[in-house]
């Protein structure tokens, strides 16, 4: 198998290796934080509130798209990153910071889920319960993470359009299933923009590497 010489140079670089390892460690810590924040928020969930969108639309069964839609997105991103490994450290760390900040938000206010909502059945894969818990509402990761990728790839028009459209689509999906309040979806765009800029500030070297052709 022929390996692109430029890719090989990155793989042999100690700086790159450290950046990748740091990114994976940070992402693992973020996922642990997400797990405990989600369980905490769900256990302490209070009353539900009215919502101008959810109160006026029926519940749709969007479980398949809700579960497997993000998997398709992550597989596409993974394939892309294999071809451009220098972009991986900044992407990893930005996603990790997103998850950590969202975990903090989830832990703060414990509004209960909307009473008339889609319930994941017993036929749902067990692993989904490691990432979503029912009370981890604010703000929507289904909306925020694709938009984060849109911001990261803003200079690449096709990816910018793809990930922005994905963020909007997933936002509509979680509202159709009454899985998030409308404020969870709308706020995700604004909070994610701030997270993206925090990532650029925190990981300047990784961002510089990301920008390389």
Across the structure, where does each feature detected by a protein language model lie?
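N-terminal transmembrane-helix/juxtamembrane module of multi-pass inner/ER membrane proteins
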Residues: 2-73, 111, 118, 125
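Aromatic-anchored segments of alpha-helical transmembrane domains
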Residues: 31-32, 99-105, 167-178
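Membrane-interface loops
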Residues: 41-52, 82-159, 167, 204-213
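Active-site His/Glu-centered metal-binding helix of metallohydrolases
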Residues: 69, 144, 182, 186
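Membrane-interfacial alpha-helical segments at the cytosolic side of multi-pass membrane proteins
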Residues: 74-79, 143-163, 189-199
